[in-house]
């Protein structure tokens, strides 16, 4: 409880919410700010003082899939996350990166003389930012929707063909089985699945 060092604090010590553009009804961007820097998750931390403001889209429109790899239930499934596969998601990613740059170059942070490491100051155009978002983008570890819930009629027919569960969390086509975790969420809640 009273120790010091990087393992004694949460990885993200600051969070923020904002709109990618004024037309949004509510915040559709979230920042997780970490007092560290690294090239990518799982690699060693950089040895210089740094912060990493990670921005994410709270309402992505890209859709992936998860499928059984075989009839063996112990075999890992095939997963395609399909991040940033829609124009809307790419637009939000670019807007988030631009807002992040504006924050980091603000007068309030001027005395810290922040330097952009990734994607780097040579990345200037929207197209270049899109490419970097595709290159650098990753999960924030709150997946949902692999067993999406939706409206199902009395005959077991779903309005949305991707619906796997009815409104009572019952798995369509299987008796006596309910799914009651984040995989049942048809869309992701803003602010993470652990405490929206």
Set out the residue ranges of the language-model regions.
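FAD-dependent oxidoreductase catalytic-site/capping-region signature
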Residues: 2-196
């Amino acid at each position: 409880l009273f120790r010091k060092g990087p393992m004694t604090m949460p990885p993200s010590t600051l969070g923020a919410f904002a709109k990618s553009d004024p037309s949004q009804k509510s915040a559709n961007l979230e920042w997780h700010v970490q007092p560290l820097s690294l090239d990518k998750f799982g690699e060693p931390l950089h040895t210089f003082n740094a912060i990493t403001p990670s921005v994410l889209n709270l309402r992505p429109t890209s859709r992936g899939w998860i499928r059984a790899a075989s009839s063996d239930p112990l075999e890992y499934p095939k997963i395609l996350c399909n991040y940033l596969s829609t124009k809307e998601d790419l637009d939000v990613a670019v807007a988030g990166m631009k807002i992040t740059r504006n924050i980091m170059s603000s007068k309030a942070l001027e005395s810290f003389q922040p330097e952009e490491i990734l994607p780097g100051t040579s990345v200037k155009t929207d197209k270049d930012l899109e490419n970097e978002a595709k290159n650098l983008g990753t999960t924030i570890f709150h997946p949902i929707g692999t067993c999406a819930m939706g409206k199902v009629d009395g005959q077991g027919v779903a309005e949305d063909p991707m619906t796997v569960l009815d409104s009572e969390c019952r798995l369509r086509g299987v008796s006596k089985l309910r799914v009651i975790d984040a995989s049942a969420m048809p869309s992701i809640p803003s602010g993470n699945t652990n405490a929206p």
